[in-house]
Amino acid sequence: PQPEAPVRITVKKRDAKNVFVAVWSFDLDPKDPLIERTPAPEAGALIALQKSGDPADKVDFLILGDGYTAAERGKFEQQARKVMELLFEQTPFKEHRRDFNVWALCPASKESGISRPSTGVHKRTPLGTTYDAFGSERYVLTFDNRAWRDIAAQAPYEFVEILTNSETYGGGGIHNLYSTASAGNSTIGYLFVHEFGHHFAGLADEYYTSDVAVTNSPDRPEPWEPNATADPLNPKWKALLSPGVPLPTPWRKAEFEAHSHEYQKERRAIRAANRPESEMDALFAKEKVFETKLLGTDAHSGKVGAFEGANYEAKGYFRSQEDCLMFTRNDAGFCAACRVAIEKVIRQYAK
């Protein structure tokens, strides 16, 4: 947001121990004549999907659309309303629904759909979203910060998720920046909420058998994210631990990993051959049946402990529960550590 008075802006990054250190700073005067004051690009009418109160007293969540033509605005609004309802089906968002205002904007695109470079598809869309970010075929991001900020500035917001007009599975979530999700994918109920969890509460991915575009330190420093730890004997969620649960907490890890590695081979083969998305949907459904049974019938299923395997690593990082929306596409919902983290953010913004 534009400051009302001169400010100093400091950019910080995390060091090897996940501690913030300043890397650059500059002074900004909002009256500086070099600041551009041209009109913002056309974003279309602001849609109030849910207005619970004054933006000063609520969490303001903005859903943006990318890759929708002017003729597809109705499609976007329908999908935006759908994902809003899906978000508020999940605890703790469900219990805090009235703490949220939800807005939507959809700048018209000249082309329908978004870029997917790995298959030769390139589109010029208002927000610039694209698959294949950082070489990961399912990672959807925009690197045009100014483009989406210019559109988002036409609405009240603290949090933003970009719905892409696409069916291929893909999305992304960056803490305190934005999240994305492919609106037409069959797993949108999981995908939209999972990616929003990254953006809204800084939740870590708890899965660790999928190919990812990041590399962790071999030293395994304590993660800054609230739902992963390198210290299973003294986890950051120790106040939530179930009585009598051993630490670290045993689970059918080897069986899960053996099955998951075979599943990942099938997944890569489908993408490598550019086979129909229906085949990926079928694979996801098959995997969900297996994982739901394995993770839901274990000795410590539903208990809070310290289960090894999280934050993209099979060893050295632990999650609070055996299953979670940040771990699988199952219907487990958010784990205890995630729920507490989400509620903490809601309390920061809602009065």
Where do the protein language model's features map onto the residues?
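Beta-strand-enriched, solvent-exposed domains that form extended recognition/catalytic surfaces
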Residues: 1-36
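Fold-level signature of zinc-dependent metallopeptidase catalytic domains
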Residues: 37-89, 104-114
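Extracellular/periplasmic catalytic domains that process cell-envelope and extracellular macromolecules
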Residues: 53-57, 94-97, 152-157, 174, ...
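Solvent-exposed loop/turn segments at secondary-structure junctions
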Residues: 67-70, 108-112, 166-170, 186-188, ...
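Short pre-active-site segment immediately N-terminal to the catalytic Zn-binding motif
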Residues: 73-76, 171-196
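Active-site-proximal segments of metallohydrolase catalytic domains
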Residues: 99-175
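Catalytic Zn2+-binding segment of zinc metalloproteases
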Residues: 196-212
